A protein has these predicted regions:
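Collagenous Gly-X-Y triple-helix signature in extracellular proteins
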Residues: 1-172
Length: 172
């Protein structure tokens, strides 16, 4: 935590990139290192993010036929008292997208959830149990909230000792 290197060694920070104390989604290592939602760390996705993805990311694992039709999305998060916009191909949902709260940040509730869609996610394994899943947050101090195994929002770091899943979205 709070470290970075100049020799190419990765120091994965769940909340932000490198030693920058900025918890906005735009600066979250997960966007680049795991999701491949952008191909420039800490920056907006470029037009080649989907067609020339960062190696060993979720984006690179998607079929090329899907990646070629994917479209970027403008994502809104909160940092240091202001709205931060980022351009992403595989973002995580925000609590407002699911529960309809905090719409002042331009995050809208998706019709699927507005119409009663499930907020519980299941493990992709033989027991198919209900699991925690990560969301973008609008907090100044963390980059993630989670949905608990009960389908309810849990804010902040209480969950950091639990294993959580991710359920990114994309647009075609």
């Amino acid at each position: 935590y709070d470290s970075d290197s100049t020799d190419g060694t990765k120091h994965f920070n769940m909340y932000h990139s490198g030693s920058v104390r900025n918890a906005s989604w735009k600066n979250c290592d997960l966007r680049y290192d795991i999701l491949g939602s952008t191909n420039i760390k800490g920056e907006n996705a470029t037009l080649t993010t989907a067609t020339n993805p960062v190696a060993e990311t979720l984006m690179s694992a998607l079929p090329s036929d899907l990646r070629v039709v994917m479209k970027p999305m403008t994502i809104y998060s909160w940092s240091n008292g202001s709205v931060v916009e980022s351009i992403d191909y595989l973002p995580l949902l925000a609590p407002a997208n699911i529960f309809g709260d905090n719409v002042a940040l331009k995050n809208k509730q998706y019709d699927y959830f507005k119409n009663g869609g499930a907020t519980k996610k299941h493990a992709y394994n033989k027991d198919n149990r209900i699991v925690y899943w990560g969301l973008r947050t609008n907090s100044d101090s963390v980059a993630f909230d989670v949905i608990t195994d009960e389908g309810k929002k849990s804010e902040g770091g209480q969950w950091t000792t639990f294993g959580i899943g991710i359920a990114p979205i994309f647009r075609v």
